[in-house]
A protein has these predicted regions:
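Post-transcriptional modification and biogenesis factors for structured RNAs
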Residues: 1-178
Length: 178
């Protein structure tokens, strides 16, 4: 077995990326403090052709040197926008028939492995602050909640790790038959 060289990875150009059919997922990051987390989510979004990222509240925006360190240029490929109020963002997404899903530990959440996708549906995944999670007001107006099952003592994952887990799972469910 031989490790592939970068030149063998069949990378898309920025133009090809922008013209590619996108995965019908929108990532909403609300009040994310860590610039490294923001950059990591951009990189994940690039890897799985995510439609766009919506940055809300205190979440920093590109261009930013610290975001760029972990995004590795993904801020140039992934569409993004910034809005102050996550509640308005969720309401507007719902008006556009986007199913809004908080990624949070709540009563009646659906475990990620049990969540069934509809192939013709667009989804918005709402991720909250590193300390407080998704705000209760946002949880209350989302169409549903997905929980990543955890078996250890912390029941807390880094937001960029959570985004990677959920995005991969939904990407797989949307793109490949079971």
């Amino acid at each position: 077995m031989r490790k592939l060289e970068n030149s063998e990875l069949d990378r898309k150009s920025i133009e090809d990326f922008k013209e590619s059919t996108k995965t019908p997922l929108i990532l909403v990051l609300d009040d994310i403090r860590s610039l490294h987390n923001i950059g990591s989510v951009f990189r994940t979004a690039d890897a799985f052709l995510i439609e766009k990222i919506i940055l809300c509240g205190i979440t920093a925006t590109p261009p930013n040197k610290e975001i760029h360190k972990t995004a590795l240029g993904a801020t140039e490929t992934v569409a993004w926008e910034h809005h102050e109020n996550v509640l308005e963002v969720i309401e507007n997404l719902k008006k556009d028939n986007v199913l809004t899903l908080a990624i949070e530990q709540v009563e009646s959440a659906v475990f990620l492995q049990d969540f069934k996708v509809e192939k013709n549906q667009k989804y918005a995944l709402i991720f909250g602050n590193e300390v407080y999670g998704v705000a209760q007001e946002a949880v209350a107006i989302c169409d549903g909640c997905i929980e990543i099952p955890q078996l250890g003592t912390k029941h807390s994952l880094n937001i960029s790790v959570s985004a990677g887990i959920v995005v991969w799972d939904l990407f797989k469910k949307l793109n490949w038959p079971n």
